[in-house]
Amino acid sequence: MNQSGKRDSWASRAGFVLACIGSAVGMGNIWLFPSRVSAYGGATFLIPYLIFVALIGSTGVIGEMAFGRATRSGPIHAFGQATKRRCGSERPGRALGFIPVLGSLAMAIGYSVVVGWIFNYLAASFTGGLNGLADVGAFTARFDATAAGNAPWQIAGMLITLTIMALGVGGGIEKANKLMMPLFFVLFLGLAVYLAFLPGSATGYRYIFILDPKGLADPMVWVYALGQAFFSLSIAGNGTLIYGSYLSEDSDIPADARLVAVFDTLAALVAALVIIPAMALAGQELTQSGPGLMFIFLPNVLRGIPGGGIILMVFFTAVTFAALTSLINLFEAPVATLQELFHLSRPVAVALIGAVGIGVGLAISPIVSQWMDVCSIYICPLGALLAAVMFFWVWGKDDALAQVNQARKKPLGRWFYPLAKYLFCGVTLLVLVLGAVMGGIG
């Protein structure tokens, strides 16, 4: 809510779509997607990945956006309204609604540690601190030192995030995403084009676009493609739902969801078109993922490419934009929840959540990997499943379809509701089970 007590809203459709893209485009697109494309056969991985993006984008993303707009609230009130309609009481829904809210806060706290690392490397790329490192061992030592002395950078990243959020949905979040997301794509596309003209980069494209039909019979290709698509689209019952709650009544949600899915996929592909050819230029295969790829192996490779110093600056600037827009979204559900539950002004709610985020974030920094695993393996898919069940099973078919099709000239076909109610909910449960059994798939 804004200072007058009215709920904040997006100033434009472009602002909403770019904010949702900013939420979806994150570290998974950059440090995980390229390595999975390389490891699981290029186009052999892309085929199931695109299938799952189409499924989730046309059901789960639409559902969370529509649920948010229908209830004009975050998960706690939204879930409560759903159970009140079905069984006459908000209490069970409100209790369950705390799961995605607390999950979003926990994920944001862990993510703030990573943002601190990124800020550290961004500064080092501009001061030349990365250029003098001789090999992977030197980069490993630097990253270990970064992780141990990250507090100032972590706090700096949090202060920038909180300042943007305190300015409001339209005045802060929307304007920040309108600036950072286009720049992210421009910078990464620029890197991709530059690398394409360097001798030896063609080998990298073969890793991306090669197709082995036999590989499609490997169940692990489908499992990891599902995990990549699911987590990349920011489905967790919190961020997309809360962004949807700021939508106007004349927003075409299915069209907006389609744009988010398309541009999130493009971001992942562009990242692959930068990272895989870069590794090929250095005569190396992409065998690493996660922080090790982004903070150790990739900087070592980029440093040795012609124009490496500038490439490092551009790369970490683009990564910073992706990280900040994702962190803003993760903190938005807890901030909005404080506003709704205690009728606080936005700056006060942001300050309280920010204090918790900084304090806990500094404390869990040494165990951030395990912290993030718990969030991504258990809490995020559970939140997504709860939101899907509340909207597609509890809310009611007629009202759910009315909200999804509102402002559309051509309503979605009869295929949508059963696809969302049965297949998407089933797939979300599968993500939760597979993640728990396998120790994570996304």
Where are these regions (language model features)?
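Membrane-embedded translocation segments of transport machinery
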Residues: 2-6, 10, 174, 178-324
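Loop-to-transmembrane helix boundary motifs in multi-pass membrane proteins
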Residues: 15-17, 23, 151-152, 263-269, ...
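Transmembrane helix-loop boundary segments of multi-pass membrane transporters
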Residues: 32-49, 68-74, 117, 172-180, ...
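Membrane-interface "cap" regions at the ends of multi-pass membrane proteins
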Residues: 1-32, 60-65, 69-95, 248-252, ...
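A generic transmembrane alpha-helix motif of multi-pass inner-membrane proteins
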Residues: 151, 364-391, 409-442
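Inter-helical loop and helix-membrane interface segments of multi-pass membrane transporters/permeases
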Residues: 4-7, 36-40, 73-102, 112-170, ...
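Transmembrane helix-boundary motif of multi-pass solute transporters/channels
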Residues: 12-52, 238-239, 244, 254-258, ...
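Hydrophobic alpha-helical segments of multi-pass membrane transport proteins
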Residues: 321-330, 350-360, 376-403
